[in-house]
């Protein structure tokens, strides 16, 4: 019978990939400082949402503008977390543009 390992899965997403990579490095550094094994950041596919909008309010359907939003996503797994690791991750100050989802 295999031993079950305790694992924390952190899923991050943001519109700015630079901000996302900085946040990932902060999380991995914090995990390594508290003697937990961090795997990642693992890049997930970027979700691209495209919008097509008519430029004119009345006629000219041939004239359109295209906009898009790109959502960059990463996953970090932390194995063997201690109470010290969880406390350090809770105190971590991350930018407002990064959405974080934590699963135990």
From Swiss-Prot:
BP-aspect Gene Ontology terms: translation
Keyword Ribosomal protein attached: yes
A GO-annotated cellular component: small ribosomal subunit
GO molecular function, one term: tRNA binding
SUPFAM superfamilies listed in its UniProt record: Ribosomal protein S10
UniProt xrefs under PROSITE patterns: RIBOSOMAL_S10 (PS00361)
Keywords from the UniProt entry: Ribonucleoprotein, Ribosomal protein
Pfam families assigned to the protein according to its UniProt record, in alphabetical order: Ribosomal_S10
Gene3D superfamilies per UniProt: Ribosomal protein S10 domain
Function: Involved in the binding of tRNA to the ribosomes.
Family from the record: Belongs to the universal ribosomal protein uS10 family.
HAMAP family: Ribosomal_uS10 (MF_00508)
Subunit structure: Part of the 30S ribosomal subunit.
PANTHER family: 30S RIBOSOMAL PROTEIN S10 FAMILY MEMBER
Protein name: Small ribosomal subunit protein uS10
Species name: Gloeobacter violaceus (strain ATCC 29082 / PCC 7421)
Underlying gene: rpsJ
């Amino acid at each position: 019978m295999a031993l079950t390992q305790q694992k924390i899965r952190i899923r991050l997403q943001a519109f700015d990939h630079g901000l996302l990579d900085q946040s990932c490095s902060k999380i991995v550094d914090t995990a390594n400082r508290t003697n937990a094994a961090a795997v990642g950041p693992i890049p997930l596919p970027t979700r691209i949402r495209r919008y097509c909008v008519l430029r004119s309010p009345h006629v000219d359907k041939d004239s359109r503008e295209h906009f898009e939003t790109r959502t960059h996503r990463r996953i970090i797994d932390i194995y063997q977390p201690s109470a010290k690791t969880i406390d350090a991750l809770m105190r971590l100050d991350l930018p407002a543009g990064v959405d974080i989802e934590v699963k135990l």
